[in-house]
Amino acid sequence: MAMASLARRKAYAVVSSSRSSVFLTSLRGFASGSDENDVVVIGGGPGGYVAAIKASQLGLKTTCIEKRGTLGGTCLNVGCIPSKALLHSSHMYHEAKHSFANHGIKLSSVEVDLAGMMAQKDKAVSNLTKGIEGLFKKNKVNYVKGYGKFVSPSEVSVDTIDGGNTVVKGKHIIIATGSDVKSLPGVTIDEKKIVSSTGALALTEIPKKLVVIGAGYIGLEMGSVWGRLGSEVTVVEFASDIVPTMDAEVRKQFQRSLEKQGMKFQLKTKVVGVDTSGDGVKLTLEPAAGGDQTILETDVVLVSAGRTPFTAGLGLDKIGVETDKIRRILVNERFTTNVSGVYAIGDVIPGPMLAHKAEEDGVACVEFIAGKVGHVDYDKVPGVVYTTPEVAYVGKTEEQVKALGVEYRVGKFPFMANSRAKAIDNAEGLVKILAEKETDKILGVHIMAPNAGELIHEAAIALQYDASSEDIARVCHAHPTMSEAVKEAAMATYDKPHSHMKSWLLLHSLLFIFVQQFTMTWR
């Protein structure tokens, strides 16, 4: 079967309601008369557990297999959730230590209780994993704890965590095994001196110095956590920029913000050697283009150079499932592989490696299996970096729009002109909107702000429904709110900003340029 390219990964289907009803009825009847499952999901992460619950809700007999022993995958256990817990706790500490006095709050001393911080994180994770198990019981999803691998296209052998083995049969088997930390040549992760994101979430003491290899989402977030708690953080990145998927203008402001917080960057740099023989770690660095080597000493190294699909040991070769050069499973617009009855979703297939994308994959895949309509548009999946400030974006960057040759307009609004931001003394950042010049259709939205991860969803809805910047601008936004900056940027996009804001924009633009030049000169 010919596989669809990533550019075609927009899942659409047109199936009549009568056909859907007949198909679903037949599946229900089959489930009630056989031990075979209608759907088997390998992997209990965001994509897998959501797919399993949705399948059961659609009347399909469903089993989910998870090797970890707790549901939620990397995201819930050692990723999204624990990192956000530590980001919030470290932010509260940093605010208490550095910002409370500005608001008239005086503290005699502020100390970090790292064990308490970790306990709060672990409690959040535990409650949420138990919550998913509760959802499985409520929705009658059979849950098998163990490592599953194919023995045939319709059978999965599971080595259970209690030492046993069982074979799970299914008419439709969904691979949702997620991704794993990408290793670097010559850099061995021991989760002590050289840690992955998993180890960085469980350090027992605050390192004096931390080197982060990789300037992506995970590296910058974890670097922020330990930087706020007192670590001297240096980020080493092979590329010329941090977060390459980010709009260039926003990225530059974002990097300046992180540098003001004390984070150091060594871009266009590669790690060519690691020495852990002493008390700390000595990294041998070299310019990406080649050149003189330097030594960087640190206490802990966080390897955050991306993730790789977890497809090894699943028996894919045995049943003939096709993968690409980096072991991503190839699927068509219905998430089916080249093997009939076998599907794949989430991080193991092409597309953004994001938990919410995996969830959408899971729902759409199961809807297709049930004869319904599934839909995922990867061009409209929002991304968020949960630092302070946060950076969120959806749609295209200005660089991507230029590359397409589309005539466009840009509207911007700085938070330094937003009433709520000024009132809470947190006015760093901006909203940037890109819209097609002729139609005013929104092409992309980029936000750098304290709560950009929440603000971005107004833009996500707008893109999903092909809205114009004027559509957003004509929506009444409550005052004073941070969301008014989105409205103002939308008004600026179609050239109708509030008259009193024009002078504000001009004044603050000039001030911003002056501060930039002064800062660069001072440095």
Swiss-Prot record:
It catalyses: 2 Fe(III)-[leghemoglobin] + NADH = 2 Fe(II)-[leghemoglobin] + NAD(+) + H(+); 2 Fe(III)-[leghemoglobin] + NADPH = 2 Fe(II)-[leghemoglobin] + NADP(+) + H(+). Its EC number is 1.6.2.6. One of its GO terms (molecular function) is dihydrolipoyl dehydrogenase (NADH) activity. Optimum pH is 6.5. Keywords: Disulfide bond, FAD, Flavoprotein, Mitochondrion, NAD, Oxidoreductase, Redox-active center, Transit peptide. It is an enzyme of class 1 (oxidoreductase). NAD(+) binds at residues 214-221, 237, 271, 306. This is Leghemoglobin reductase. It comes from Vigna unguiculata.
